[in-house]
Amino acid sequence: MATATAISDASNAVVVPVVPAPELVQATIPGSDITVGHALTSEAAIIAKIGADTFTATFGFSVSAEDLDMFLAETYSETNVLADMQDPAVQTWAARDTSGKVLGLVQLVRGLSEPCVPGDPTTHAELRRLYVETTAHGRGIGSKLIAAVEEQARAEGFKQLWLTVWEHNPKAERLYLRLGYRKYGDVDFITGTCVQTDHVLSKAL
């Protein structure tokens, strides 16, 4: 299933302290040809491409070409993706097939929350940028990536896992709702000069 999330406007986010994370959980799905584990810096280029291609396919029609180009250059350049991967507050996960090819990605982000998310902000973590290569849709990869992030967040003691999803992406929102997430509010999402609305969803872990 094609799913995508986008980061919320940083001006709305609540910054909370980041604590050191325990050893990463690795997820191998029994009976599946997909393995989910933390991404390698050597995979930054393919992760940047999957992110840019999926974002363009999902959201590109809704903004001008200039705004899209600006956003992609700021967010999905290989340099910026690599910087994210080296940020101790961010853990990037990759889904790989048996050949080792990266087919999807997702991020666990520590130290940010939204005011509408219930509970203590210091116990919140964010699920960010769930993207699956278009040729790999329909294989349950999105759900497997979400499950891996949820498992890691629980292992680190987080109590709420929140995310944002574009208001005009009902397919992605249905997936999250089916997996137990609930809508708690809305935030602005800025692409270049275009301001759009994302729904804030969260799940108790």
Question: Can you name each region flagged by the protein language model?
Answer:
Residues 113, 162-165, 177, 182-199:
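Conserved catalytic-core motifs of GNAT/GCN5-like acyltransferases
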Residues 137-141:
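Glycine-rich ATP-binding loop(s) of histidine-kinase-like ATPases
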Residues 3-9, 13-23, 29, 38-44, ...:
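Acetyl-CoA-dependent GNAT
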Residues 172:
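Helix-turn-helix
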Residues 132, 166-167:
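Short amphipathic helical patch at the helix-1/turn junction of helix-turn-helix
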